[in-house]
A protein has these predicted regions:
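Short, surface-exposed beta-strand-loop junctions and turns on beta-sheet-rich folds
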Residues: 50-52, 71, 140-142
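Short beta-strand segments
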Residues: 14-48, 56, 62-68, 75-80
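Short amphipathic alpha-helical segments
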Residues: 3-7, 51, 56-60
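Short secondary-structure boundary segments
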Residues: 68-69, 128
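Short Pro/Gly-enriched beta-strand edge/turn motifs at strand-loop
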Residues: 13-18, 105-109
């Protein structure tokens, strides 16, 4: 099984993710719409006043999942990740990812203008260190597999996931 290909095939199917952040030992989870690039970095937009944005400013380590809703009796398939998040403050960085938001989410034409306003929605990047995929990949047995990415731990064993 090629876990990277599983991830690449699954990401286009889902437009929102659950994002976990933490500050001062107080965890938080929220839903955000996301886009991704060829290197499997994740991007989202948010106001800096939101709790998850404040958490990221204090503690950039994040985790989350990207899961398609399923019905009773249907075996779930999902992606999980851990990595670091950062505010993209550089205009060139924002300009580089703007097309991803327009193509995937139909974002408005003025999202760069809005991001130039400190009170507007800003661009955030998540550099994923480890991906995990959960589902039935090779037969009838469900499994969770790990893919180290961008300097993540090299173990393919997902028992710690």
């Amino acid at each position: 099984m090629n876990i990277e290909q599983v991830i690449r095939d699954y990401l286009p199917q889902i437009i929102h993710m659950s994002l976990g952040t933490s500050q001062d030992n107080k965890p938080w989870v929220c839903e955000v719409h996301f886009v991704y690039d060829d290197n499997l970095n994740l991007y989202f937009r948010s106001l800096t006043s939101r709790r998850h944005s404040q958490d990221i400013a204090a503690n950039p380590r994040v985790a989350g999942n990207i899961v398609k809703q399923h019905v009773v009796g249907e075996y779930p398939l999902g992606l999980y990740f851990e990595g670091t998040a950062e505010l993209l403050g550089n205009e060139d960085e924002r300009r580089a990812v703007e097309p991803l938001f327009k193509e995937r989410l139909g974002a408005a034409a003025d999202i760069l203008t809005e991001a130039a306003n400190p009170d507007g929605h800003q661009f955030y990047k998540i550099t994923v260190a480890n991906w995990y995929a959960f589902g039935k990949f090779d037969g009838d047995k469900g499994q969770k597999v790990k893919l180290a990415w961008n300097g993540g731990t090299a173990s393919q064993d997902a028992t710690d996931a």
